[in-house]
Amino acid sequence: ELGIQNPYALDQKQLDAAIALLKQQNTIIGEYWSDAVAQITSFAGGNTVVGTSWEILRKFAAKPNLKTTLPIEGSTGWYDSWLVSSKTKNVNCAYAWMDYTSTASVNGAIAMNFGMAPANTAFCASSAMAQAHCDEFAAEDEEFWKKVAPWTTPIETCVDGRKDVKCTSFQEWTNAWATVKG
């Protein structure tokens, strides 16, 4: 009803509505966590039964009953990537490293180590273990990924394409979040 197309492109009305909902939900929220150890402890101890998380935490949880679900509304996510500084002294070496880490075997090993979907899905067909990992993290499920909005820093230029309104900035989000947590 608010016309939100991208959760990282909220105008003031949309941000205000989101903050109002979060404040309303404070009565049913057990805790907000900001670090992985606190989150794993909360799930493992039974204090938390549902929440947003990083996929890697499932790998380290003592109880293997942590599962991932994708809400019908979609979810947020992020992509890890290598970046090359404009001031790097060894550009060719940097690009060679990026080429190497993008190969199916290396990218897949990184994905398995960190508990995430590989970017190079050629990895999935390399072994039964690789395919099981790709299945667990929906690596080849295009419909799944269409519902995941990649993380981006909120800025005033709306990244969802709207031109008739100013979106809210990261600082505005930070200030609003402080009112939720108290």
Question: Which role does the model predict for each range below?
Answer:
Residues 146-182:
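Conserved C-terminal helix/tail region of periplasmic/extracytoplasmic solute-binding proteins
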Residues 69-77:
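Venus flytrap/periplasmic-binding-protein-like
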Residues 76, 85-151:
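Mature extracytoplasmic/periplasmic domains
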Residues 19-23, 40, 44, 52, ...:
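Non-transmembrane alpha-helical segments in soluble domains
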Residues 1-3, 79-83:
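Periplasmic solute-binding protein
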Residues 2-10, 87-94:
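Short helix-loop capping/hinge motifs at secondary-structure junctions, enriched
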Residues 1, 7-69:
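Ligand-binding pocket segment of bilobal, Venus flytrap-like solute-binding proteins
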